Amino acid sequence: MDYTEKLTRYVANFVDELAKSGVTDVVVSPGSRSTPLALVFTEHPSIKEWIIVDERSAAFFALGLAKKSNRAVAIVCTSGTAAANYYPAIVEAHYSRVPLLVLTADRPHELRHIGAPQTIEQIKMYGDYTKWFHEMAMPEASDKMLHYVRNKASHAKHVAEEGNPGVVHLNFPLREPLTPNFSLDAIWGTKSYTRQNIMQEGTKQLAPNQLQILLEEVGPNKKGLFVCGPQADAEFADAVTSLAGKWGIPVVADPLSQLRTGQHHKDNVIDGYDAFLREAEIRQELKPDYIIRFGAMPVSKSYLFYVMENVETQQYVIEPNEGIRDHSSNQTTFLFADPTTLCQQLEQMTVVDQDVSTAWLKTWQEMNQIAKHYLLEGVEEQITEGEAVRGLAEVIPDGSTLYVGNSMAIRDVDTFYMTSPKTINILANRGANGIDGMVSSGVGASADNERVTLLLGDLSLFHDMNGLFAAKHYKLPITIVLINNNGGGIFSFLPQAKDKRHFEALFGTPMDLSFEQVAKLYEANYNHVKTEEQLKAALYESYQLDGLSIIEVKTDREQNVQWHQAKWQLIKEAILKDG
């Protein structure tokens, strides 16, 4: 058996086992050393390949695809700095718990550390951001080695998705010649080699005595508060809102919790909290007896102030798997159990009498209604960033996905995207919270050909402009709502804005770019809108079109700050007056 046959069978058995383990998509960036992986993935009948030239964009595309599908996506690149360009997306995947299979080609061992071209240190190059690293053996095709390569494939996929999902890195040292021979018989292996390991996990639950202790400490007839951070389980919304309804307590719902949209019970859902928790005097009126938080911390800084001011309040954090995600410094009990199952069990165990007090819930509901009234009222002659979110929420198609950029975009969605009977999957890269890779992530989420609306700022689009190529090349159904305030709008809300000498150069960073020309470059449908009605019309039009659309909303940074502050002041005055 010559080396080409060994290489072909080795790589083909690896790829076939990934497919049998459930991997359906691979994102490939061109390169020579990765030729065997790229060609074999492309030839496999059960795996869809996506070709994206820039590795940084490719990795974020895969991240968006994996986040949307809740399953591992493979990425393939050649040796050298190509692999280094994956780093930002790997960091984001680690912190936001998204499963990625990173498959890097490498020079064989005899070419390392001697100055061979395109050769860098790839062993554990992503450090602690991976759940597992493995240096693959050199290609061989003995029965033992084909069992080995299949075992590593199935194990890699399982590790990426088990527990807290994350990144697995397999490094493939490959010698020349690199081109596989697809004329070989039984290239995908024989039946005896397939499905080396079948791995299944059960649902993690608290023991009955733990549930009873928890129920005695919390439950109805106390001023409790549910807080819901980002969630991916479609059944969670029904479970937590049903329990909240039985206990008569409010549910603070981050936009990524999936509680603001859908058909579940929403009477207890509080969506305007970011606006009214800004005021210290209001926060003082809302001291809870306990807080139960599901998932990571919400986006809202106002909520962070609130929870940190209630340092003596017992806080419980419910996570499906081990790991601490809490920077409030509060006394916290971490309970590692499936959140949906826990809510269902607590509801079944709860016996509620007819005298459950609703005063605590009503206080939150009344403040919430006041906040929503002022946040949603009025129509400006020139569209504001908050109105852009309001208009988007009104016309976005039921059953579609909203991918939200970081910085001001996610904060405006937190403030202005209110509860709706539509079912909208709201996603964002809130692991490391960077603005890089946002275009590619949103485009990746549209890879299943279901409509995605991407809301982001001009710096985010500029930072990842070449992410538009995949949308153009594959004609993916994505509408980009571009909030162009000509720079870093969020800094205008921060203390840095007070130093006028260096603010524009260091923080405002105006670029004066023509995004209409960007749209032309990538053959996108383009609209520039000036009012909320124009935005809604442009959105509706884009949803009838195929492929990529860019809708530009131009705003002024200083006016945007003043508009937000005026809203917050009206809410503060109205709540304190009623109180």
Swiss-Prot record:
GO biological process: menaquinone biosynthetic process
Catalysed transformations (reactions): isochorismate + 2-oxoglutarate + H(+) = 5-enolpyruvoyl-6-hydroxy-2-succinyl-cyclohex-3-ene-1-carboxylate + CO2
Role description: Catalyzes the thiamine diphosphate-dependent decarboxylation of 2-oxoglutarate and the subsequent addition of the resulting succinic semialdehyde-thiamine pyrophosphate anion to isochorismate to yield 2-succinyl-5-enolpyruvyl-6-hydroxy-3-cyclohexene-1-carboxylate (SEPHCHC).
Pfam families: TPP_enzyme_C, TPP_enzyme_M_2, TPP_enzyme_N
InterPro entries assigned to the protein according to its UniProt record, in alphabetical order: DHS-like_NAD/FAD-binding_dom (IPR029035), MenaQ_synth_MenD (IPR004433), MenD_middle (IPR032264), THDP-binding (IPR029061), Thiamin_PyroP_enz_TPP-bd_dom (IPR012001), TPP_enzyme_TPP-bd (IPR011766)
Family: Belongs to the TPP enzyme family. MenD subfamily.
Protein name: 2-succinyl-5-enolpyruvyl-6-hydroxy-3-cyclohexene-1-carboxylate synthase
EC number(s) from the headed UniProt entry: 2.2.1.9
Biological pathway: Quinol/quinone metabolism; 1,4-dihydroxy-2-naphthoate biosynthesis; 1,4-dihydroxy-2-naphthoate from chorismate: step 2/7; Quinol/quinone metabolism; menaquinone biosynthesis
SUPFAM superfamilies: DHS-like NAD/FAD-binding domain, Thiamin diphosphate-binding fold (THDP-binding)
Required cofactor(s): Mg(2+); Mn(2+); thiamine diphosphate
Organism encoding this protein: Oceanobacillus iheyensis (strain DSM 14371 / CIP 107618 / JCM 11309 / KCTC 3954 / HTE831)
Alphabetic keyword roster: Magnesium, Manganese, Menaquinone biosynthesis, Metal-binding, Thiamine pyrophosphate, Transferase
Cofactor binding note: Binds 1 thiamine pyrophosphate per subunit.
One of the record's GO molecular function terms: magnesium ion binding
UniProt subunit comment: Homodimer.
